[in-house]
Amino acid sequence: MKVLIANLDTPNYIKAMSHFGAECVNTREIPESIEEYDALILPGGDDIDPVFFHQEMNGSRDIDHELDVTQLTLCRRFAEEGKPILGICKGAQVINVCFGGDIIQDLPDGKREHHSYHQGRGTGEYHETDIVPGSFLAKLYGEHVVTNSYHHQAIGKVGEGLEVLQKSDDGVIEFMAHRSLPIYAVQWHPEKNCWDTAKEGVADGEPLFTYFAEKIRNGK
């Protein structure tokens, strides 16, 4: 399988997909054709330019407009082809914006501390989440699971066709899946906690990456 990762310098994502023999290609450019690629990963990163969801700047920072164009374009093209997409953290927000949703540009006090990356010590937070019973995600993790958290923004209005499957204990959306396409948007970071880096008591990314790899192999 050949996976396009829409940014440079993503060793954790490459390492995770290497468990399935995937060839990963990093890019900040829009290729002429996506025919050779089986799937797309939209990785974590800086904030999305709010122009893409029709808002003024209101707490967003570290904008990379050029990369946003690449990621949103690739998301649309892979979705049009029905190819699997996995968006993580910012990537989940890119998926939401691609389908017409918007972003909470800066979580309010209290929630922000519950979810944010701490730049001074290089760590994130951990919190309880609830998963929709009977969903494929519940089959992977159960209905209640602790996840890591490294973000100050969050999904606001949910994009068309996307279904919320997981929320944190304070109501922040943590996972969405498209109702008819193999598209998965996860706000937490499975690539930071999987296989040899897995932390006991915290959601292990391995089941999610395995599920995604199976979707790639099945072509849907």
Regions found by a protein language model. Give the residues of each.
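Cytosolic ligand/metal-binding cores
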Residues: Q93
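N-terminal beta1-alpha1 cap of cysteine-dependent amidohydrolase-like domains
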Residues: M1-L86, N96-I104, P108-F136, L140, ...
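Short catalytic/ligand-gating loop segments at beta-alpha or beta-beta junctions
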Residues: T147-H152, M176
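Conserved G/P- and acidic residue-centered "switch" motifs that form tight phosphate/ATP-binding loops
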Residues: C89
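Catalytic cores of DNA base-excision repair glycosylases
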Residues: G142-H144
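Short beta-strand
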Residues: T147, Q166-K167
